[in-house]
């Protein structure tokens, strides 16, 4: 992995040879650095003292550092499948992985009030909140994501799912910023999104002649792993943090010797993210060809060996989502994902098809993006449902009192604007009504011989159907606030050989895929509505 890929935002360079008054982190992060910079050198004691004295709290804390709110309104079962229109499966697969990111979705499902949203109708955070709420409260159904989600990204071609994923995360992060133009980098890194997905790399340079030390801290939202010579995620991580010798042309300029000097460079993690996104670099930046090789990844990963502070106990992450690309290059193919619902069952999310699966199938994929969450965070958010009330989907209990959108408040800047809530959800749900869906379905109905997702009339005796396909009777319009007569999920968890088809929707565009141009380095701009 190239070093430049680590610079995803502003960086703070703590050089032990000079005092940089412009480099300030918040007090909590400064405390971590006091204990992590323990190298012994002739200059380390004095410079470390100056460094710590110079640190100050951030100008503005955009989100509280205490634990994120929990939600007892989250159904424990799996949510809806997503309808595919054209080459938008890269959108669907990214949305599903974000929907089952517990700290994010539970925050959006909470009913806490906050300030007025400054982005109004073009707020990506509000649009995602409406989608996640709708998807999680529509188990057994197929919904169509709002076109607003990809308005600033989609070009009518097949795009890269990881690019869209990070585009969406970054857009939500920007939506969390208050309506002030002047904000320092440190304040921007205190948003809700950065607290969930973000942390810091510590790049430490040790000069071999004078024994000086220079540290640079770079924020990140995901970690790219070079798998060219790695057979597992563990090997890829070890290669990433392995000390590198810097000699000759690669020598670093020493602030004490005032010349280039041999040095060693080491990457470690001074802070840990609640959610860890690992992207496996499968595609060539030049040709777009895919590196189709099996890379082993575990369901649990201890990240303590890669932390700046050692011997502080295990830091266990658990796998909760896997994004998979099926194909031979980034220009074509198909995306699907595996996600773990809050009750612990794994599901394969392939556009409209939602199929129960097992951990063996999950771990045998040629993964493209891996999603891990700290074990303590998973347990905390999972227990919130059982503590409040029995996990359920919107159903019989809602007959007497339907859940209205006014009740689905969120701890986000647009919670006190009910008109915006109504508009966003109405806009999202209108795109999936029967009238909008039936006409293109009749015009573009796939021929039987090309229907690769055709469901046979006779099912094996060991298959348990959670809900029937909506295709034959037409897709109904389901809203989060409407009551639903939904079938309860069986408590029996099938094995990999007992996969369950939980719904299917025929492709509106057939199974052919358009080719995709190489947009790896193209810039994206967020849509702004007037």
UniProtKB/Swiss-Prot annotation:
Protein name: Inactive ubiquitin carboxyl-terminal hydrolase 17-like protein 7
Location within or outside the cell: Nucleus; Endoplasmic reticulum
Coarse class of the protein's main subcellular location: nucleus
Organism superkingdom: Eukaryota
Segments of skewed composition (Basic residues): 513-524
Nucleus as UniProt keyword: yes
GO process annotations (BP): protein deubiquitination; regulation of apoptotic process; regulation of protein stability
Annotated spans, Disordered: 382-412, 431-454, 490-530
GO molecular function, one term: cysteine-type deubiquitinase activity
Biased composition (Basic and acidic residues): 382-392
Disulfide bridges in this chain: none
Gene Ontology cellular-component annotations: cytosol; endoplasmic reticulum; nucleus
InterPro entries: Papain-like_cys_pep_sf, Peptidase_C19, Peptidase_C19_UCH, USP_CS, USP_dom
Family to which the UniProt record says this protein belongs: Belongs to the peptidase C19 family. USP17 subfamily.
Domain USP: 80-375
Alphabetic keyword roster: Endoplasmic reticulum, Nucleus
Compositional bias of kind Polar residues: 490-512
